[in-house]
Amino acid sequence: MGRYLKERNPAVQIIAVEPDGFSALLGLEPGLHVIHQIQGIGDGFIPSVLDPGLIDDVITVSDDDAVYCTRKLSRTLGLLVGTSAGANVYAARILSARLGPGSRVATVLPDRAERYFSTALL
């Protein structure tokens, strides 16, 4: 997705999201597993489908912020998503504040909440 966007507009910035205190993308030793609550990201490796050369920056998000945003998406917008989606939206809000008025920020919501129904998440 990042390559496609940059081919269409070289000014596009690709921002990765990682759990707070851990980021293989920021140079933490790959394979080091840190316990966090944001399922689906920060698993201690860089996936083969990811080209780190396309990433312009990394925003880290705490467990609490990811869970808060996930719950807010559910309660205010009816979006039943998981914590990686909550982390992405939280990071998008941080980026939007950094870039200021008139900027455009897009993100993806990569998961759904059905696997979390038996947890305290929702």
Language-model regions, residue ranges each:
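Short glycine/serine/threonine-rich phosphate/pyrophosphate-binding segments
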Residues: 1, 84-92
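Surface-exposed amphipathic alpha-helices with a cationic face
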Residues: 2-9, 96
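Active-site/ligand-binding loops adjacent to catalytic centers
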Residues: 7-83, 120-122
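Short glycine-rich anion-binding loops that position phosphate/pyrophosphate groups of nucleotides
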Residues: 20, 86, 111-113
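Phosphate-binding loop/pocket of nucleotide- and phosphate-handling active sites
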Residues: 44, 90-122
